[in-house]
Amino acid sequence: MELRSNNSTITAPKPKGIIDPNTGELIGSDDRFFRDINAELSDKGFLVTSADALITWARTGSLMWMSFGLACCAIEMMQCSMPHYDNERFGYAPRASPRQSDVMVVAGTLTNKMAPALRKVYDQMPEPRYVISMGSCANGGGYYHYSYSVVRGCDRIVPVDIYVPGCPPTAEALLYGILLLQKKIRRTGSIER
């Protein structure tokens, strides 16, 4: 949140939302029912919020990922899970089953023979599901781009949300991709997806 300065007074910007054209105020800001409930519950330690904001907050802090390591990028993905980087501090924990995971990290060269397996695993993931494409080979074929047996990017098989470039990308780059995915989830919410 950015603070605006008006001479010597610092004020926060008005909250964003749907504005009533008649009054110029946010819709629901003058609703006595919600004002009374908020006043009654605020001193008891309760927070009144929308369900979408609560779901989005919980989802960004508890992303369960499943690795789909196909080549050398998978080693950097494993390094990201080690204590030096510790991606679990961001709520990004590994899962072995696609039915328990929210994020699939495709790391490495995707061949034509492996593409149906990738799609099958992706279809087993529950909604909302996200895909991080890690490395040049997963992004666009990489070094093997002109080979007859390589898919030129995993986005031809599954929809990709975040691309992490590099050959192989560093663990820091993957962590940055994870943080970008969390930012994307916060921005889009769960209902819009």
UniProtKB/Swiss-Prot annotation:
Q: How does it sit in the membrane?
A: Peripheral membrane protein
Q: What does this protein do?
A: NDH-1 shuttles electrons from NADH, via FMN and iron-sulfur (Fe-S) centers, to quinones in the respiratory chain. The immediate electron acceptor for the enzyme in this species is believed to be ubiquinone. Couples the redox reaction to proton translocation (for every two electrons transferred, four hydrogen ions are translocated across the cytoplasmic membrane), and thus conserves the redox energy in a proton gradient.
Task: Tell me how this protein assembles.
Answer: NDH-1 is composed of 14 different subunits. Subunits NuoB, C, D, E, F, and G constitute the peripheral sector of the complex.
List the NCBIfam families. Answer: nuoB_fam (TIGR01957), PRK06411.1 (NF005012)
Give the keywords, sorted.
Answer: 4Fe-4S, Cell inner membrane, Cell membrane, Iron, Iron-sulfur, Membrane, Metal-binding, NAD, Quinone, Translocase, Transport, Ubiquinone
So what family is this one in?
Belongs to the complex I 20 kDa subunit family.
Q: EC number(s) in its UniProt entry?
A: 7.1.1.-
Task: Give the required cofactors.
Answer: [4Fe-4S] cluster
From the Swiss-Prot or TrEMBL record, state where the protein is found.
Cell inner membrane
A single Pfam family, by name?
A: Oxidored_q6
Bias (Polar residues): 1-11
**Major site of localization recorded for this protein:** membrane
Q: Which GO terms describe its molecular function?
A: 4 iron, 4 sulfur cluster binding; iron ion binding; NADH dehydrogenase (ubiquinone) activity; NADH:ubiquinone reductase (non-electrogenic) activity; quinone binding
Q: How cofactor binds (record note)?
A: Binds 1 [4Fe-4S] cluster.
What biological-process GO terms show up in the record? Answer: aerobic respiration; electron transport coupled proton transport
Segments carrying the region annotation (Disordered) are: 1-21
Name of protein: NADH-quinone oxidoreductase subunit B
For the keyword Ribosomal protein, the answer is no
Q: Which organism is it from?
A: Bartonella tribocorum (strain CIP 105476 / IBS 506)
Record-annotated residues binding [4Fe-4S] cluster? C72, C73, C137, C167
| HAMAP family xrefs | NDH1_NuoB (MF_01356)
